[in-house]
Amino acid sequence: MADVGDLKADGSQLRERPSAKPLHLNNSDDAKQKVLKLNDQEDKDHKNDESKKRTYGRTPDGTVFIVPQTHDMVSQLLSPSQPKNLSDIAVLAVLASLILTFYALPKSARVPIFAIIFLFWRAGYNAGIGWLLDGQSKHNRLVLWAKQSHIFEKPETGKNPNPALYKLLKRELETKIPKDYKFEEAPLEYNTWLVFRRVVDLILMCDFVSYCLFALACFNRPQESWFLWALRWTTGIILFLFNLWVKLDAHRVVKDFAWYWGDFFYLIDQSLTFDGVFEMAPHPMYSVGYAGYYGIALMMASYKVLAISIIAHAAQFAFLILVESRHIDKLYNPPPPRLKTFLFVNAFAWRLWYTLGLGYILDRQSKKKNWTKHFIKYGDTKEEAWRQWKSLYHLSMTMSHASFVALAWKMYSLPPDGLTGLTLFRHVLGAGMIALQVWTAMSIYESLGEFGWFCGDFFFDPPSKSLTYNGIYRFLNNPERVLGLAGVWGIAIITWSPAVFYVATTAHILNLAFLQFVEKPHVIKLYGENLREMSGVSKTVRQALPDPVRQWQSAADQYINTTVESIEAMLDRARSKFAGSVDTFVNDTTSLFKSYPARIPISRHHSEDLSGLNLKQYKLEIEGTTLPPAVEQQKNGGREGELARTPAIRTNDFKTLCLEYGAPIRVRWQAPLNHSKKDWIGLYMVTDNQSRKVTRISSNGRWVATNPDAFDSTRADDGILVSDKLLPANDNDEESTDCYTGEVEFHGDKLWWTTGVFEFRYHHGGRHHVMALSQAFEIRIPKFDETDVEVDDNGTIHRAVEETLLPIIQNCFDRDPEIAPSTSEEPFGSLVERDGKFARRVVFAVHQMFGIEFAPEVVQADGTVRNLAWRICNAKKVLAPYSMSATHGRNTPTMG
């Protein structure tokens, strides 16, 4: 780097640029500031010459390094100017084998085989790469694999078990990156990313080539006019070229770093301008970037290609939602406010109710008059049913629109550059669409009146058996289908938020379903042949079209109607057949189990050779914050028999271990020298395990490894304090031998946040064989005894409640100084409001200690220990008339 090995803290000597040796800084924040400074300096020094500009990145541990220039996969594989290596030859060989397979197969076998091949590579892309990236994002799994395998360490150190693989990787990667890169000096994260992207190259190239070969196998020449042929090919080519431009422009903006998901491994801090295709649509590489698939389907004139394109596109969106978006939110976005989530769920729920809920009521009313029957059953009239329906419909419609506007208002943010360019166009277009929907709604109400607006013909017989086509209905048969949701889309275009677009899309689909499956059958039943087949606008447009297009439209309409009727008939047949098959299956299965009542044993562990391990050398000791001895007296409350009311007499020095609720617990372990590095310690309720030798219930995350880096998860190492510390044998004990000791701490989410009796279990080799058990201990929340505290100067117990409450709340907040208060006046940290688990812990403790149950929102609203203590005292005053226990102080108002 610049020489990053010789860089000073103030950033001097940045212009010397001798080597690419990384710089190791103290923490991630310092590294971020250094990278920003370096990249800004490079932008200034080489503003007019991009070829000489270097890019700097950083790893999570604070290592700053030069990110060498790399090239896209197509250039690497096919460009003669780019150096080639063994992995390039392997990828090209796989691609060549796909092409040879295509030509070797008979035409009848190409379609099914290449459909399977493409779906395999698509699964490798979305499921395979998605799984790897998800593990890397959550647990740093790929980097941990590389670290544990030592494949990037020099063979001279003796740690690398595969020197030949090291030399191969060094030759492969340095061949590809001749400038600013040394294999042995590059950070572990960057080398891991380089190997990962070679796997990505193979999967992505095979995915695209197998799709193209499948499309060629499905090529079809339909009988059509020259006009349709030209229209189909022109549209397909335009979509394909548009797809190509989207990919190239996206790569121009994000470079290889984002193209190959580099931010899952390391980060580049610099100022980027997201122009071009990124101003056109959200996530352009996954949305409009798949237009070429549909263009190819058009050119091939194949519904099979269209179907598999839709499947691939849907899988890509699933990859975006489940993997990439979660990582982006985790890395770049602060935790989303709970209000936004609530507003989204609220708008979505109201839209579902408005279409599905009201649609179901209207469907039952149309077929069985269920709504009217319900009111008549309880003594009301059909007029009352009609009035109640109008109220419900109006409320549902108002809340549906209001909740959507509230969501859009919360999601909307004015761009930093103001209303200019495309942003201004979006606002003008959106405002126009909103005005269009308002005008449409007013026109519909003027034409239909109150009776038609509230679907009156579902409840009363219409005054006429023929529809009157006036107002807006003179031009459109069903304006709600075409213009009814224009304003919803206008708001979505203005906000430009994925959440608002999702609700708008859902609303449109549900509206079309309502019109097709609820309103249309009812209108046909009422008015039958008196319906107008074609609206005024449709008739005018149809007359302006050429004859071939009109003929094609008629044929297409007939084909679609025939297809819909066939599908409905097929579903009816399948429904009856499926119901009969299910009955047969249930009867056969029942008789089979009656005939063969065998028990199938299920075991969750495999037999394993534990010879050579001495169980006597495994030990566990517990150290935690114990409760005062006075708490033990709360066990005896006068509820026992006469003999059991006195404290039990012990015959040894054993003491019951009773620990504080939520306090960290340290566990010291001892194991033989040959113990497995994948040993682990779990925390369980004593009553959850019947066996003392094998654990048969999951720990739900309440476990810590004995040795660091033994598992593919950073969570496993959280809590390790000491590992494999040699404990020499006791010379005075002949049976004593050398052994290892260590210490781990259970805190936060690794604790049980309830009361009960628990134990720690030491497990062998990453499995569930129990090698040692700790002493059973109890987690208890002592009752607050008002008779045993002193009142303050005001005659209240407020101060005593504060003092009792403060340590409990500190434990509930994981004793984290960022959120846990150090005094009763200090406010809670902001994380308490964002994550409800902290408030729920406090609510449970308060209920156990004071006998008062609060909602978690009360804890978040109070914000300090003092306020919460005041609320507890006030609640005890209010509930005092219902309590028979004696109290100190003035708990009820005095008359005087």
UniProtKB/Swiss-Prot annotation:
Its main location: endoplasmic reticulum. Residues 107-112, 220-225, 278-279, 326-341, 425-427, 503-896 are cytoplasmic. Pathway: Phospholipid metabolism; phosphatidylcholine biosynthesis. It holds the Pfam family PEMT. Residues 1-85, 134-198, 247-256, 301-304, 363-403, 449-481 are lumenal. Its EC number is 2.1.1.17. It is found in: Endoplasmic reticulum membrane. Keywords: Endoplasmic reticulum, Lipid biosynthesis, Lipid metabolism, Membrane, Methyltransferase, Phospholipid biosynthesis, Phospholipid metabolism, S-adenosyl-L-methionine, Transferase, Transmembrane, Transmembrane helix. InterPro entries: Phopholipid_MeTrfase (IPR007318), Phosphatid-EA_MeTrfase_fun (IPR016219). Residues 1-19, 27-53 have a biased composition (Basic and acidic residues). It is an enzyme of class 2 (transferase). It is a multi-pass membrane protein. The chain crosses the membrane at residues 86-106, 113-133, 199-219, 226-246, 257-277, 280-300, 305-325, 342-362, 404-424, 428-448, 482-502. Residues 1-61 are annotated as: Disordered. Catalyzes the first step of the methylation pathway of phosphatidylcholine biosynthesis, the SAM-dependent methylation of phosphatidylethanolamine (PE) to phosphatidylmonomethylethanolamine (PMME). Belongs to the class VI-like SAM-binding methyltransferase superfamily. CHO2 family. This is Phosphatidylethanolamine N-methyltransferase.
